[in-house]
Curated annotation (Swiss-Prot):
GO MF, one annotated term: water channel activity
Tree of life domain: Eukaryota
NCBIfam families (alphabetical): MIP
Domain notes: Aquaporins contain two tandem repeats each containing three membrane-spanning domains and a pore-forming loop with the signature motif Asn-Pro-Ala (NPA).
A Gene Ontology biological process term: water transport
Physiological role: Aquaporins facilitate the transport of water and small neutral solutes across cell membranes.
Keywords on record: Membrane, Repeat, Transmembrane, Transmembrane helix, Transport, Vacuole
GO cellular component: membrane; vacuolar membrane
Name this protein carries in UniProt: Aquaporin TIP3-2
Pfam family, one: MIP
Amino acid sequence: MSTATGVRAGRRFTVGRSEDATHPDTIRAAISEFIATAIFVFAAEGSVLSLGKMYHDHSTISTAGGLVAVALAHALGLAVAVAVAVNVSGGHVNPAVTFGALVGGRVSLVRAVLYWAAQLLGAVAATLLLRLATGGARPPGFALASGVGDGHAVLLEAVMTFGFVYAYYATVVDPKRGHLGTIAPLAVGFLLGANVLAGGPFDGAGMNPARVFGPALVGWRWRHHWVYWLGPFLGAGLAGLVYEYLLIPPADAVPHTHQPLAPEDY
């Protein structure tokens, strides 16, 4: 089921129509994702560069104080990014969230592809602006800690992203979310920050392929990059399927009327 504005019921994978790509609502949603992702990545990656500038060593993020500072920047940055985009695009701000919504039938493939393009471009634009504004500072990006293998990192990314997308579904997508939708940006932001505290020392806690892609491209750091795509997509896809098919009753699969801070068009 869909409407002219792109509101979709879940539980049915849909490719979408070619004209959907040029629909004004789709274009507005893609622009929203571009800007929101840029806001988030600028704050998140900027916090890492800031610590490196203060202490002349990016390894300071491995200290307790540095880790808390970076986690806080991620949490606040994402909360704001989701808040400013959720009523326009659903506030995905993350290709993995879009993938979870895709497998759950909440967005068409056409819209998902446009979201992915907008998110990646937003991340690259934010990282380029950071490099220009900081006098050419090379973004540190993401890397695996000593002793952490590719398989460990994929599992860690999958688990963290599963929880993140599950929280997104519960606070943004679930038709019975009620007033819980008003705290959706804070809920997902806090969980992101908590996961950075939990996973940061091991693999940087990506959970967002766009967040990883921007610094990787601008800083040209590609080692283990595939880990930060495979893990989040596995976790997000599983979260979308679990919440959509096990926790949302069939009768509630059709989106209800608009509520504050909950998207009418995602």
